[in-house]
Amino acid sequence: MASTMKLAEYLFSRLRQLGVGSIHGVPGDYNLALLDYVEPAGLRWVGNANELNAAYAADGYARIKGVGALITTFGVGELSAINAIAGAYTERAAVVHIVGTPPRSSQDARLLIHHTFNDGEYRRFAQMHSQVTVAQTCLRDPRTGTKQIDDVLRECLRQSRPVYIEVPVDLVSALVPSEALQQSIQMEDPIAASVSDVFDQIVHKIKSAQQPLILVDGEIRPMGIVGEVQQIIDVTAWPTWTTPFGKGLLNETIPNFHGVYQGSYDAPEVHAFVQQADLVLCFGPHFSSTNTYAFSSIPQPEVTIAFTDHEVKVGTKTFRDVPTKAITSMLVQRLNTLELKRYDPYPSLPREHKLSFADIDGADSLSQDRLWRLLANFLQPGDIVLGETGTAGYGVREMPLPRHSRLFTPVTWLSIGYMLPGAQGAALAQRELTESSQYFGIENARTVLFIGDGSFQMTVQELGTIIRLNLNVVVFLINNDGYTIERCIHGYRQGYNDVSSWRYLMAPSFFGAPEGTYTGSARTWGELEAILGSDEVCDGRGLRMVELVVGPEDAPKGPLVQFLQKQKARERTSRSWGTDTP
């Protein structure tokens, strides 16, 4: 390796070392020189329809491969992406946002140039991003540029959240030392003197538990403890649930897995069992209202051991600066030697289950009270499944997942439209892993997207990117004439919850899909059975799209149905009192 290289070459070499194979984005005059170095560095350039979609796609890519990256231009481009960057921050996707900026001379002279507020101020956009990224750097000096890049990327890895790198156009080809590339970016976790004390208290709680259970949340992925948590579940054989965010990270085929815990919305026997537990091992908590069924699924603190990034809570006592991965690894080793609570007989607790078409009249119209447990039969090992914010996001929580599957479901940010470009990014990451034989031995892996019509209209352009890259994506579009999730919450008869009626199955052709690309529509169970039985849909390649037509008030069982029922009950009460409410 030469002793020096161009700054852009250094940046892209580092990204390749982190496992990044593709960079998303949109070209703009302040990043064009930077883009010249993407493909020579061995990276694939993915040009998206707009910067928002590019950032969504980089997020989806990051959740599968660990790190994603996008490049935008200064001002207009980066602000278009910032909503998605905020979502990645909230739900902990490690996205590197690289922004091409005006030359240093223009910034220093405060020139009034395009893509600015025309006031000579160049730092506002970076200040905005400081609120939604964990580290930011503006490269100004070739002598310090490589260290700045490494420091920011280290924080991206350590915290699994977005970072922000500004590259002035006049620094792109500046020579920098290459020596640092000979070593990977070093990660240093704090080691607390109290590790043994924490571990001893955890072991004591586990040994004395009489009704223990396990609750797994989605932050085990960025924490890097998915494997350890799975081993703990396997060894203890204790009843296990996930939150919506945690679903899809575990092996759901084991007998002690019971699906998503819905708190007060769950079956009475499940809610009672959790409430009566004397120990809850909670891994990777992300306790937002939308991830905990309005906070009702949060376990009682006094019986909970909660494992977060660098903190363990044992009951109401908090131990800070604790390396959680080390603790969970120690726990895996110790469990085999402990006398654990063994459920014999095992408690009678419901598990997720599929439905069969044999149990349903094929002439009946589709309805979401049964749809999702039937669609579960379509899923294959290794599928990446995405359920968009809306009825689809609630529905996919009901689906038992096969081995090695992943699930993206609404968690906290809930920006509708995310899942379509997110599916593009996830499918691309999936293909890169299969091509390098790193995907569980599966060769024909699929990405399966469930999305409502309203969300689809937000980001439909990324069908074109999926088609251009020939990604293996199956799209199930829920056509319910608008925002049914909003109808359930408020205004179920109001026009503001309607959307334009599109001919959705013409979209693949419009966006350039090859002639013969599969599209199909189902209104009845019989029509859906025929579609799901098609080899072309199940085992084909490239884009396939299926429209599922349901009623405008149709929703999966659970909170949405209850919200709608309460809304209608209030309306009946208002009418009985001689008033009228929407």
Task: Name each model feature, range by range.
Residues 31, 51-56, 78, 392-394, ...:
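Short acidic loop-to-helix transition motifs that present clustered carboxylates
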Residues 5, 28, 223, 230, ...:
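Conserved structured core elements
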Residues 98, 106-119, 226, 328-329, ...:
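Thiamine diphosphate
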Residues 2-339, 381, 472-475:
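N-terminal alpha/beta PP-like core and its mobile active-site loop of ThDP/TPP-dependent enzymes
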Residues 8-11, 16-18, 26-29, 34-36, ...:
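Active-site diphosphate/adenylate-binding microenvironment
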Residues 2-3, 140-143, 178-180, 200, ...:
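Phosphate/pyrophosphate-binding active-site segments
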